[in-house]
């Protein structure tokens, strides 16, 4: 992180508002929460800072993106009155990081959940192993690998939004 003090956090936040040309941010996300970076969050009182900014009307909703194991996810989700979370989830990584268990826990707490990496960095968007193709070919519904990956994530009622990176118009159309 670029901040090395509580004062730096204030400066960085004000610079973000300036770059966005706004007086407030609707959804402010602490990125890359994990056990190592969480120490920084605690050391520099980041949660107190964000609470203050919310009270001032400069932040509307506070959330975090998570990159650690499920046990740490349980700790973080109970440390603050979060308003949304972002986790990695796809049909290969259902037990990776927060995983499906984290998704379910966030849902139990009534938190909107944003999913990142539904295509595992594009690896689930291309050719599948023959065994997978064989199973999919037997399905009544015919879908592309991208459609299967999105459908798997979207079928969880706890999922609010699915993010997907794209580098071409064709990928954009396929993601819709």
Outline where the language-model segments fall.
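Active-site mouth loops of central-metabolism enzymes
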Residues: 1-8, 36-39, 132-143
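Active-site beta-loop-alpha junctions enriched in small/polar residues
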Residues: 1-4, 30-35, 65-69, 87-92, ...
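Distinct, well-ordered alpha-helical segments
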Residues: 6-17, 21, 38-48, 68-81, ...
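Structural preference for beta-strand elements that scaffold enzyme active sites
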Residues: 24-29, 58-63, 83-86, 110-114, ...
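Active-site-proximal beta-alpha loop/turn segments in soluble metabolic enzymes
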Residues: 31-36, 84, 128-134
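Surface-exposed amphipathic alpha-helices with a cationic face
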Residues: 47-60, 102-108
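Structured C-terminal cap/extension of enzyme domains
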Residues: 79, 100-176
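Acidic, His- and aromatic-enriched active-site or binding-groove loops in soluble protein domains
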Residues: 82-96, 140-141
């Amino acid at each position: 992180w670029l901040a090395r003090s509580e004062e730096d956090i204030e400066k960085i936040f004000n610079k973000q508002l300036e770059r966005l040309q706004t007086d407030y941010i609707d959804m402010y996300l602490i990125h890359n929460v994990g056990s190592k970076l969480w120490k920084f969050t605690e050391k520099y009182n980041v949660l107190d800072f964000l609470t203050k900014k919310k009270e001032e009307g400069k932040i509307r909703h506070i959330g975090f993106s998570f990159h650690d194991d499920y046990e740490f996810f349980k700790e973080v989700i109970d440390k603050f009155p979060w308003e949304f979370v972002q986790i990695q989830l796809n049909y290969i990584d259902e037990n990776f990081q927060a995983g499906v268990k984290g998704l379910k826990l966030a849902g139990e707490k009534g938190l909107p959940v944003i999913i990142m990496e539904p295509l595992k960095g594009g690896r689930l968007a291309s050719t599948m192993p023959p065994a997978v193709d064989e199973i999919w070919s037997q399905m009544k519904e015919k879908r592309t690998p991208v459609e299967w990956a999105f459908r798997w994530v979207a079928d969880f009622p706890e999922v609010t939004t699915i993010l997907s990176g794209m580098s071409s118009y064709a990928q954009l159309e396929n993601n819709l």
